[in-house]
A protein has these predicted regions:
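Low-complexity, intrinsically disordered Gly/Pro/Thr-rich segments
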Residues: 69-73
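Short S/T/G/P-rich N-terminal loop/turn motif that feeds into the first structured element of a domain
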Residues: 1-67, 77-95
Length: 95
């Protein structure tokens, strides 16, 4: 499994609401249909979120990232994006 975490700090609360609504209704459904395992968006503050995207492998994660390139460029205008990503090292779940 491959995971990508993106931290986004928006210029305003209204920008955050617009982008997260777009993520929920457009980006996530499309990405899930293209092979992403799951996607979650977590609120940090009134203008800050982080997303967690899980993929079966890096190839699929890169394919999904390619689908979002133009959108991410637009989101980055007036926002600060920080990305972390990597292969699952240890996984745990309840028995």
């Amino acid at each position: 499994m491959y995971c990508r975490v993106v931290h986004i700090k928006f210029v305003s609360e209204i920008q955050m609401k617009m982008v997260t609504s777009y993520m929920e209704h457009t980006m996530l459904p499309r990405n899930l249909a293209a092979g992403q395992i799951s996607g979650e968006v977590f609120k940090i503050s009134e203008n800050e979120v982080f997303t967690i995207s899980k993929h079966p492998d890096k190839v699929t994660a890169d394919k999904i990232m390619a689908l979002m390139q133009q959108e991410l460029k637009e989101i980055a205008v007036g926002s600060k994006l920080t990305k972390l990503e990597g292969q699952l090292l240890i996984g745990a779940s309840p028995a």
